[in-house]
Amino acid sequence: MNTLIAITGLGIFCLLFEILNFRKGIVPFTILGLLGVLALNFYEFGTTASYYNNMITVSKFSTAFSSLFIILTIFLVALSHNFYENHQTKISDFIAIKVFLLAGAVAMVSFGNLAMFFLGIEILSIALYVLAASDRLNIKSNEAGMKYFLMGSFASGIILFGICLIYGAMGTFDIAEIHESSLSAELPIWFPIGMILMTIGMFFKIAAVPFHFWAPDVYEGSPALTTALMSTLAKVVAIATLFKLVSGLNLIPSLENQDLSNTFTNVILTISIASMTVGNIMALRQVNVKRMLAFSGISHAGFMLMTFLTIATSAGVLLYYTAAYALAGIAAFSVILYVCKNQDNEDITNFHGLGKTNPLLAAILTGSLLSMGGIPIFSGFFAKLFLFNQALHAGYVAIVIAAVINSIISVGYYFKLILAMYSKEPNEERTGKPFLIYAVAIISIGLNIALGLFPSLVLDLLN
């Protein structure tokens, strides 16, 4: 709760910086403020409490994921300094939106009431709609903002309809009361229907197949920094929230009918395999790097959904996987922001010869792509290893085989970009070494490797 209040206060201070004309100091001030919020969040780790009639609940799950969200936001704010250098008059607005977006993200994993859950989703979503369309003179950005707004509105409507059905079945929005009522023998049919509608709405948010069709166009059309935010922070928030929703509302045990329970498991299996396969196959044919990473994100959503098959014991694995994926994504987009800063697009041709003109950033991008592909020593490899091991122990052999095949396929399009950096001649000489871009890229890939070398640091937090 203190974390949420501190984040909201920091967002208000960011808006005041615009009024007081302190724009030059807003990025370092916000980073220092977020580091203070992170320390406060660490201090609360291990405590369990509820606030405002259980509207907000603090637990290890919420604190651990909130820490990850804060770290990712620090990186994104740091990247804003160079990205918005030509829009200095608006930089405080963009920074404040990111901080308020973080408040929505923390609320989404700290909810104890469905009203707070929906409020968190809307805070996050509205901030993303604005950021997607923030390049107002770019028609692709306008199109991305409109598409994202329409699809997000439909998803929010479906979620709200599900919440209404759950309220009709249980007579309360409180998660603890719903959980307790779901253990009873007599359970209204509206409850599983409402839960299924909420799950479908969240599948839109994480861009899982077949609810993924908005992602490639929105990722490609949005400003590169917004795409980085969507593919890392927003996706991780949505999958963590869905995990808490399904486990907190006791959906799977509440399906007393064995056929219903098996149906839910089969749906998760189908969507997981479909997301992995469609995402990887479509990524193979992409020449735009942002669009390629959009399909890669769809594929990773399929991998993350595998944790729902063993939901009682997989919170630690989900935290580890999301951390590994998000850190690799931040490192990759740091390099993309540097390479494509003055370009009209983010095509692979822009990366030709990067290994010769800037070996350090080429190595960082290579490392982040190898992590996403599941190559050791990066944490992406161990994330998939722990995920597959858990699924095998639960008896889900078929999905593990499909996941391994898809991991092999993904290496194909990652190496397409890697080969372009090292085997092609550079198109142009790039000058300048922006400190914050280099710092974010080095620290994020360093943290990714550290998680691979010491996985227990994250895995044991929620086990």
Swiss-Prot record:
It is a multi-pass membrane protein. Its main location: membrane. Keywords: Cell inner membrane, Cell membrane, Membrane, NAD, Quinone, Translocase, Transmembrane, Transmembrane helix, Transport. It catalyses: a quinone + NADH + 5 H(+)(in) = a quinol + NAD(+) + 4 H(+)(out). GO terms for cellular component: plasma membrane. Its EC number is 7.1.1.-. InterPro entries: NADH-Q_OxRdtase_suN/2, ND/Mrp_TM. GO terms for biological process: ATP synthesis coupled electron transport. It is found in: Cell inner membrane. The chain crosses the membrane at residues 2-22, 25-45, 61-81, 91-110, 114-133, 149-169, 189-209, 223-243, 264-284, 292-312, 317-337, 362-382, 395-415, 434-454. GO terms for molecular function: NADH dehydrogenase (ubiquinone) activity; NADH:ubiquinone reductase (non-electrogenic) activity; quinone binding. The keyword Manganese does not apply. It comes from the Bacteria. It is an enzyme of class 7 (translocase). HAMAP family: NDH1_NuoN_1 (MF_00445). NDH-1 shuttles electrons from NADH, via FMN and iron-sulfur (Fe-S) centers, to quinones in the respiratory chain. The immediate electron acceptor for the enzyme in this species is believed to be a menaquinone. Couples the redox reaction to proton translocation (for every two electrons transferred, four hydrogen ions are translocated across the cytoplasmic membrane), and thus conserves the redox energy in a proton gradient. Belongs to the complex I subunit 2 family. NDH-1 is composed of 14 different subunits. Subunits NuoA, H, J, K, L, M, N constitute the membrane sector of the complex. PANTHER family: NADH DEHYDROGENASE (PTHR22773). This is NADH-quinone oxidoreductase subunit N. It comes from Flavobacterium johnsoniae (strain ATCC 17061 / DSM 2064 / JCM 8514 / BCRC 14874 / CCUG 350202 / NBRC 14942 / NCIMB 11054 / UW101). The gene is nuoN.
